[in-house]
Amino acid sequence: QLFAIVSMLMIIPSVVAFVENDYFVARTFLYSCFAGIIVYALIAIALSNITKVQNNFEKLISFILSYLFLPMLMAVPLFLSLDSVRFQDSWLQMVSAFTTTGFNLIDLNTSSTGSALQLWLLMGSWLGGLFFWICAISILLPLNISRFEIGAADLSDGTSVKRNEPINPIINCARQLIPIYIIITVGLWLLLTLAGVSGFKALLVAMSVISTSGFEPIKYEVGNLFLIEAIIFLFFVFALSKSLFSREINEFQKRKIYNDPEIRLAVIIVFSVTGLFCANSIFKSILENAPLDFVILFKNLWGIFFTVTSYLITM
């Protein structure tokens, strides 16, 4: 089903390219969309007689294989739209996006590439973040191989899986998490727009931040840099702990936020590392007999604080 969803989503960058009068890229995305839907339909027909329900291990294998084959589909319009790019480079670029790694092989920030390809790259990372979030709760959590089992000892039966597990936990999790994911993304998009970032660029930044992909689609305006970073930092908090989202999914998470072990650990790490770097800057100034400029010190402190937090949420 995700194969068909990714194929249909290609219509969005196709429309963007058409609006920009980039008809070649628009046709590339549109034809890739049709080809993906046809391939999905053929596979669905071939497997229609198979009624076996996957167990958790088989779901894990499917989850892993998704990171191999879905980026191949995502890479097709990227490869066809850029003459000087090999398919393996396009595939690795989309693997980087879908896994929210943020490793950039192809520079799409030039004026010659257009907005559609930039949007598709960020859509890939945004979908990858949502995909991993859903699968981490519905697949990795029952197998106890993710960090989501922190606090699971509070359950009465000593496990991290509910006994009344739904027939299809992936769909159940998706119904609960997709609206939250969309609302957070739209909220960040609107706030960045109010801060002075253009609508399209704000959307790219919002998808990059919420998916924790690390892609930097734009260069911020210097005058609004602190305000933009402050807004982004507010949304970093949502990535620090699962209990901020999934209270209904896991009963053991019904506790106060300040008692959450993940929040406490994040606060300790961020303030400790920031304090060490700040102390190092002050110590260097003392050794060099340089006067302390508190404005520069505050900027350095904020930069360290922001950077440490951004690294932490990608872990």
What is each residue range found by the language model?
Residues 1-315:
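Membrane-proximal intracellular helices of multi-pass ion channels
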